[in-house]
Amino acid sequence: MRTSIHRSRRLGALVAVAAMATGLLAGCAKDSDGGSSQAGGGDGGGKGKITLTVGTFGVFGYKQAGLYDEYMKLHKNISIKENVTTRTDVYWPKVLTRLQAGSGTDDIQAIEVGNITEAVQTQGDKFVDLGKDVDKSQWLGWKNAQATTKDGKLIGLGTDIGPMAICYRKDLFQKAGLPTDRTKLAEQWKGDWNKYVDVGKQYMKKAPAGTKFVDSAASVYNAALGGGKERYYDKDDNVIWDKSSGVKDAWNAAMAVATSDMSAKLKQFDPTWDQGYAKGTFATVACPAWMIGYIEQKSGDSGKGKWDVAAAPTAANWGGSFLGVPTASKHQKEAIELAKWLTAPEQQAKVFAKQASFPSTPSAYAGLKPATDTTAYFSNAPITQIFADSATTIPVQYFGTKDQPINTAITDVGILQVEQKGKTPAQGWDAATKEIKDVLGQ
């Protein structure tokens, strides 16, 4: 993932923290939101050169992996300028304004997964249909589906994804008398997050002093929801959050955690959560691929060799983005070629090697190589294989236009009411319901 975390927390805080997770906050001329102050499609770069502008948020890793320089060496007539905005919640409204105006867009615009449904439903005619210019089979089917309009236009090419695993402290498991082998653990909770909760109950019987099984109930909710077939909307864009089987199952698993003693009751990406890694106060966390670097950074040297990675109960996704070409681009042909090249399997593998952004192109998986230090940090776990297995079995989920704020209402209002304030699950659900009705204007 670039460094914008998209799903279940306050966006501003998330994006900034995610950038720290990879340690790759870009240095650039900044406006008031901490991003680049320039925008707009590229013009001539002098002496017949074409300047292509690429609008991104956070850190996509293209510059850091040397991809822009490589492309410009291969195409002497092309100059590339990246316009970066740190925060997604600042970036996307600006993009929408420019799309609606029909001018001022970059030649390539990044689209975060939390915004892709809005782009597909309300801005589809403002983007070029890229499906005519690429072999769509290069990307995961569910990834393409997220960026495809009802009339079949593919408005974005997949960049990274966030396949899920369980990262765990094997030293704490050993002290609690539990198996430490990643394969055995994966078998214990395979197919059901409630089985994961059952392992948590076993852990707490002999938990090392000062430790809990899991960081938060919201962590379990998001991971479980990401593996379900339904979220908050059906495929016809009808709101079904209060009837969704996926929401119900995820909520029940989260409540089993929130009403027990197994949660550290930490809010993800708050400073106390970071401190929890450093102090070793929780034994497991549901971890998408991009969180590997974050855990390594926050746990520090003392965590080396203590962390391990096992397959999650169900395949799930948290994160990912796309590259689209606005119809307002002055250089559509050249922009399409650059977008195709940046998202090709070979280039996605290079970005993974630089900052662990997991590719959305399966043909890249066989050659992926995480950093040697990272592999050792996580007890030589087959990280690439674990995440690849998850990536290829993730269910296709439909994201509605208010998907993100509904999710935040459930995690930051409903679940926290139970976990941190001692409310009953029914009271937490009622609190989330009130917040969601406000979001939906009901």
Sequence positions of predicted segments:
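Extracytoplasmic/periplasmic substrate-recognition and gating elements
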Residues: 259-260, 297-360
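Periplasmic solute-binding protein
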Residues: 120-122, 144-184, 216-236, 318-325, ...
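Short helix-initiation/N-cap motifs at beta->coil->alpha
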Residues: 84-97, 113-114, 188-195, 264-279
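Conserved N-terminal structural module of periplasmic/extracytoplasmic solute-binding proteins
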Residues: 2-116, 135, 180, 330-334, ...
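Hinge/lid segment of periplasmic solute-binding proteins
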Residues: 112-165, 194, 304-308, 376
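C-terminal capping/gating helix-and-loop segments adjacent to ligand/active sites or protein-protein/ligand interfaces
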Residues: 378-432
